[in-house]
Design a protein with these regions (language model features):
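C-terminal alpha-helical cap of glycosyltransferases
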Residues: 156-182
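Donor-nucleotide binding loops and adjacent catalytic segments primarily
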Residues: 1-78, 109
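A short, well-ordered alpha-helix in the C-terminal region of glycosyltransferases
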Residues: 143-157
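A donor-sugar binding/catalytic signature common to diverse glycosyltransferases
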Residues: 69-110
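Nucleotide-sugar donor-binding patch of glycosyltransferase catalytic domains
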Residues: 100-128
Length: 182
């Protein structure tokens, strides 16, 4: 519903920057009717700080770990996350607009670069860019639709099963067992 935008901010156990600051930057672009769900993962300190700052704001829902995360991602107009492989792949498989923020150096920055280069996500390199990119995606549903279409072109919806099949086959090979045909 364009009148009630939903943004999900997933911090993860390793954090995704200063969550209270990120919340402060996202809330103004949501307006009075928008909603922000913040998932802090196992980062108890981030949850405590966010609760102190925003626990009484009806536009903000604060969560620790959420299992499964899929329903929250599917309900989001925009997902703000680091570019960890699991959450990013899950979001792209579902088809959710993504803004990457504060990726951890190494594989997450490589993931962010790949997602940005292939138009699968927007990468907010600064806090100001975070605000601008979330606002832009919320104002322009056609940009979200274009991003989701690119995600569906790149991401195999059956990738989880294929990965599991590879792992089973390789494990069986290491154990000297034959893998039954699927």
């Amino acid at each position: 519903d364009p009148a009630r935008p939903e943004v999900v901010l997933v911090g993860g156990s390793m954090g995704a920057g200063n969550l209270p600051e990120m919340i402060a930057r996202i809330l103004p672009v949501l307006g009075e009717n928008g909603h922000l769900t913040v998932v802090c993962g196992s980062n108890v300190d981030a949850l405590r700080r966010a609760t102190e700052a925003y626990g009484s704001d009806p536009r903000v829902s604060l969560r620790a770990q959420v299992t499964p995360l899929t329903p929250l991602i599917a309900a989001a107009d925009v997902l703000v996350t680091k570019s960890g492989g699991l959450t990013s792949t899950e979001a792209m498989t579902i088809g959710t607009a993504i803004v990457v923020s504060h990726p951890i150096a190494g594989c997450e920055t490589e993931n962010a670069r790949y997602m940005e280069d292939n138009e699968l996500a927007l990468w907010a390199h600064t806090d100001d860019e975070l605000t601008a990119k979330v606002a832009d995606l919320l104002r322009h549903p056609e940009k979200r639709a274009e991003m989701i279409a690119k995600q569906h072109e790149k991401i195999d919806p059956d990738c989880a099963r294929k990965i599991a099949d590879i792992l089973i086959r390789r494990t069986n090979e290491m154990m000297g067992r034959k893998t039954p045909d699927a």
